[in-house]
């Protein structure tokens, strides 16, 4: 109760809901690849008095007075994230990864422009051209995918499509692709067809920041990410640039004719283009998270994420599960359950009953609807934050298999649930105090 003392007194209905969610996080295994546990320090910054402050604009150029302290925290967040990724430019104001992506699209594209992005069913993301998303509704997307045999990105296919379609932008990144991405090849393809290269690294950002996966910063014209997932910070977005800080397309100001910097274009699109006031309490939490990411122990953590994912994938494959591409280089894996005769929805719901949280996910050539799917996606960032290592991944693989193999057996699911509770008790969530 100590984390919610005031709230219990003022609004017990909301306190009870939050307490229930805290119990769920503490007592269950979190395998959703996009989720993690923010530190107590991150949560304290996000719950601070900075939530009261409006600060439209940027440090030194605000539309409101009284911004001397929030200017400092935004400058600190920008400096830290630039150091973390080796970037020359950073904007830490986007409220989410999707809004960061929106700012990029709105800056460099016009409605109807052609964009090449990864097929959602092959591991892409909603904002990479899904017809139900603004990206697919405003722009003309063509898709690249994975090779049906290797289940990895087919770079020759990407180049072939790019030459044929001549997109204005190539979007690279994924939400359910388990292999390292060769950004250098994507840049070569983009340069060949005169396209703008945009990299969305929301999922593997923490692993990229510590040099464990290739970085797009030297290759992409612009890079976006979220700040949670493998970065383990607050929910939010960022935009970064490396060597292409100067405008490579020669865009000029209408009145003065001055060549515009890409940083100017992006900053103006974030505000006033797609947002108003920044969330200064979240920016403070981002600064705290970036500070944690810069510590040596974060590299140890990031390495363990990958080892855990590879161990979990190997243990599941040994039990007959089809993991796309035959393994993982990062923090996640996509499991095609069709050889098990189980839908993604059924697996997710059964695992939920066993206190193992996953998400159903479409797989290539899926014949089921997005609300059912033929696969599930698993990730190890949250498990690794709890301190779990390879032996626990072997145990968790066995528990997952027990549930899916006996998906309609309540006795088995209840037994697994008790084992999950015992395992979680051995590895408490850092900073998440037990309820009274």
From Swiss-Prot:
It is an enzyme of class 2 (transferase). InterPro entries: PyrdxlP-dep_Trfase, PyrdxlP-dep_Trfase_major, PyrdxlP-dep_Trfase_small, Ser_HO-MeTrfase, Ser_HO-MeTrfase-like, Ser_HO-MeTrfase_PLP_BS, SHMT-like_dom. Keywords: Amino-acid biosynthesis, Cytoplasm, One-carbon metabolism, Pyridoxal phosphate, Transferase. The keyword Nuclease does not apply. Signal peptide: none annotated. Pathway: One-carbon metabolism; tetrahydrofolate interconversion; Amino-acid biosynthesis; glycine biosynthesis; glycine from L-serine: step 1/1. It comes from the Bacteria. The keyword Cytoplasm applies. CDD domains: SHMT. Pfam families: SHMT. One of its GO terms (biological process) is glycine biosynthetic process from serine. The record marks 228 as: Plays an important role in substrate specificity. Homodimer. This is Serine hydroxymethyltransferase. It comes from Roseiflexus castenholzii (strain DSM 13941 / HLO8). The gene is glyA.
């Amino acid at each position: 109760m100590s984390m919610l003392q005031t709230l219990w007194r003022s609004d017990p209905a909301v306190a009870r809901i939050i307490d229930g969610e805290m119990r769920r996080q503490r007592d269950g295994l979190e395998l959703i690849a996009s989720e993690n546990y923010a530190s107590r320090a991150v949560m304290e910054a996000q719950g601070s008095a900075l939530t009261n402050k409006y600060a439209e604009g940027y440090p030194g150029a605000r539309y409101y007075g009284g911004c001397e302290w929030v200017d400092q925290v935004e400058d600190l967040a920008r400096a830290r994230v630039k150091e973390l990724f080796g970037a020359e430019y950073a904007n830490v104001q986007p409220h989410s990864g999707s809004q960061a992506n929106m700012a990029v699209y709105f800056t460099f594209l016009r409605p109807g422009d052609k964009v090449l992005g990864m097929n959602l069913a092959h591991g892409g993301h909603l904002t990479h051209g899904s017809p139900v998303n603004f990206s697919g509704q405003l722009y003309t997307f063509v898709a690249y995918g994975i090779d049906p045999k290797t289940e990895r990105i087919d770079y020759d296919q990407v180049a072939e499509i790019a030459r044929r379609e001549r997109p204005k932008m190539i979007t690279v990144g994924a939400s359910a692709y388990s292999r390292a991405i060769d950004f250098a090849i994507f840049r070569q393809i983009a340069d060949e067809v005169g396209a703008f290269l945009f990299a969305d690294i929301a999922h593997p950002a923490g692993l990229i920041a510590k040099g464990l996966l290739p970085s797009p910063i030297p290759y992409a014209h612009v890079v976006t990410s979220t700040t949670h997932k493998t970065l383990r910070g607050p929910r939010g977005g960022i935009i970064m640039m490396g060597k292409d800080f100067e405008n490579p397309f020669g865009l000029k100001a209408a009145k003065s004719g001055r060549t515009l910097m890409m940083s100017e274009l992006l900053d103006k699109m974030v505000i006033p283009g797609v947002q108003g006031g920044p969330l200064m309490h979240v920016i403070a939490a981002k600064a705290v998270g970036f500070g944690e990411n810069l510590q040596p122990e974060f590299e140890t953590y990031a390495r363990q994420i990958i080892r855990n994912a590879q161990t979990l994938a190997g243990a599941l494959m040994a039990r007959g599960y089809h993991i796309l591409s035959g393994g993982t280089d990062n923090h996640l894996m996509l499991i095609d359950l069709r050889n098990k005769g189980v839908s993604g929805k059924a697996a997710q719901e059964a695992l939920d009953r066993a206190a193992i949280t996953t998400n159903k996910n479409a797989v290539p050539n899926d014949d089921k609807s997005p609300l059912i799917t033929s696969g599930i996606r698993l990730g190890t960032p949250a498990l690794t934050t709890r301190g779990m290592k390879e032996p626990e991944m072997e145990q968790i693989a066995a528990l997952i298999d027990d549930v899916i193999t006996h998906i309609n057996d309540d006795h088995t699911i209840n037994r697994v649930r008790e084992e999950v509770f015992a395992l979680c008790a051995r590895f408490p969530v850092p900073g998440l105090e037990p309820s009274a």
